[in-house]
Amino acid sequence: MNLELSTPLELMGRSAEFQRIVEVLAEDGDLLIAGVPGSGRRTLVRRAALAVGAIILEIDCIRATDGERFVQLMAEAIAQNFDAVKIQDWVASSGKEFFRFQMQENSSIPTGKLTPMRSLNPKQLWQAFELLLGLPQILAASENQRVVIILQSFPHIRSWDRHSLWEATFRREINQQTHVNYVLIATIAETTHHSEETNYPLETVQLAPLARDVVAVWAREILQTVGLTFDSRSKAMQLFLDAVQGHIGDAVAIIRRLQALRRPDGLITEQEVQQAIEELLKDLSITFESLLMLLPGNQVHLLECLATDPTEKPQSREYIQKHGLSRGGSLQGALTGLQHKGLIYGAEQRYQMALPLLALWLRQRLS
């Protein structure tokens, strides 16, 4: 039996955020969704886009390593979601200097592949980008539909878009379109300093960790659908809630393990929860080890400190002296770096670890 983890948003504790996203999209607004990985960012945006009847175009900005790759990914998303014949007509009439479209013959429904021409020089690539930005509006208007462009991990493009030219142009052009909205997904709600931020402000929705009682209700509802329940005579539920710390992604991972460990009576005891956690940490250990190897040494040290000795004031003199942390800019840089990577929350969440299973693994590793 497969565990069905889709659940009403009311049980996920995100109904207010969901409603706000729907309202903004319905009013032709654009959004920034800020939250750590596993907080439900993409699920919320996808469901909200479907709720307003929009076609969804998704671009993973981690894969967009430069402007050319960004154009390629955007072209792919458009080709996968719109009428191939209309795209072919657009290329023939407006885009043949910069794009080519290859119709796929082995499908009952016409599909095709839209790609930028090879070896475009920087000026041509920029022209291709500006031209492509107008295509979703043309296609959406022809079908009388809305489009929501979801840019996952959006801040990654700033590694090559040093002066925010691509970002500013994208936001300006989409803002002027009547059938297209965009949603930026990031770990923190940082602000930029270019003029487009003032001219075209974003509605920001921040996803904090879920409350314990919300996770408890969600977990009970999910487990009941497959005939499982926490043993009320044990501390199984408390152990589960302590482990996930309001992180829906980690909660899902543990619940999947609990299903595999089911007892004949359907009860989940502390033993099953502990076993599920231990097995999960064992499977994740290579991933966590690799993550630490990619982090600067001062970030690793700070992460270990926050996992083993949580504090609301990592910049305090006492905490710095206790753990041998660097003072001043180096410490602040490490805090900011860990926030950008989605590994810790900021001051508003008391600098707690954002990935509870990573925190648990670090504590076991250092004990």
Where do the model's predicted regions map?
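A short, conserved structural fragment
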Residues: Q339-Q349
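Short amphipathic alpha-helical interaction segments
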Residues: H323-K341
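P-loop NTPase nucleotide-binding core
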Residues: E23, E27-V148, S153-I157
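Helix-loop-helix "sensor" segment of P-loop NTPases
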Residues: T191-D242, R263-G266
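Short, amphipathic alpha-helical interaction segments positioned at domain boundaries
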Residues: L357-S367
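Sensor-1/coupling segment of RecA-like P-loop NTPase cores
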Residues: G35, A141-E143, V147-L151, H156-R162, ...
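Winged-helix-like regulatory helical subdomains adjacent to P-loop NTPase cores
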Residues: D250-S326
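A short, basic N-terminal segment
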Residues: M1-V36
